């Protein structure tokens, strides 16, 4: 049980009035003690979005993800059931699989060759028949909660947690409304960065489009930041803006009404539905420590044979749009520790 020291607590009415709101104090973004508390109270108890369903579409498909220092294995069994486990052999603790891919019909530990079925059951342990009182029944992989929800895969380290819908009520319906083809998306590109910034710093940047005009000129040339709304829905939020065709970013038929949807979901995943049909981008955050966050920036299309325009758009995300945000959060993370920063900044509410 993590107990937070007084300097890392806030009053219950903190920022109750948005017109008088400030950011949380800088120390919450920089101090390891705050992060250690978040590991146990946030990330060990919350549903974390880890992938799109297309990455685990076929039997034997698997992915691995690092969540608060725990390597998690998600695999689709030969019976087509999705399961998740701690990616660690119960014998001596060696990691079983790395990266993403297709598993064999048994997962074999590279250390002592213990073999496990895809449902986590121990299939074979060399010499176990000669080991007195060897408990094969209690030598299975340790399971982790996993759910598929509105086209995406979520895991939860808390075996007693409710469902994804319990944590994010109404999110699934909104995702399907904003991107009706969500189930048919396929991964087209992934940009992985080990970002020197606190996970909340990155979330803050996403939640405030106050920076979109000056910091994202290509995005703002399409998505109209003066026709842009942000609504709160408990543990998720929705940003919505009307869009027009742009040669700098999103190209689509002139005269066609289109829009951008941006959804943040607790604690640290961001869904984006650009003003183009059959496309999404997702920012997956995997916090490493108080000032480091591993990020996957994934781009999805419904088609796999990408057009020249889609390839150019991927290049724009990789070379222009994504670096714009990375520079911002990295600079802020440094500035939060400066003697010249007064410890908190104002929230610039619209009114």
What is the role of each PLM region?
Residues 45-56, 125-129, 264-268:
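Short Pro/Gly-enriched beta-strand edge/turn motifs at strand-loop
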Residues 24-67:
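Non-catalytic accessory segments flanking enzyme active sites
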Residues 1, 26-29, 303:
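Terminal targeting/low-complexity segments that flank the catalytic cores of oxidoreductases
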Residues 55-159, 163-173:
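Rieske [2Fe-2S] iron-sulfur-binding domain
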Residues 6-26:
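Short, contiguous pre-domain boundary segments
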Residues 43-47, 94, 211:
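Generic structural signal for secondary-structure transition and capping sites
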Residues 3, 75-76, 81, 87, ...:
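C-terminal catalytic domain of Rieske-type non-heme iron oxygenases
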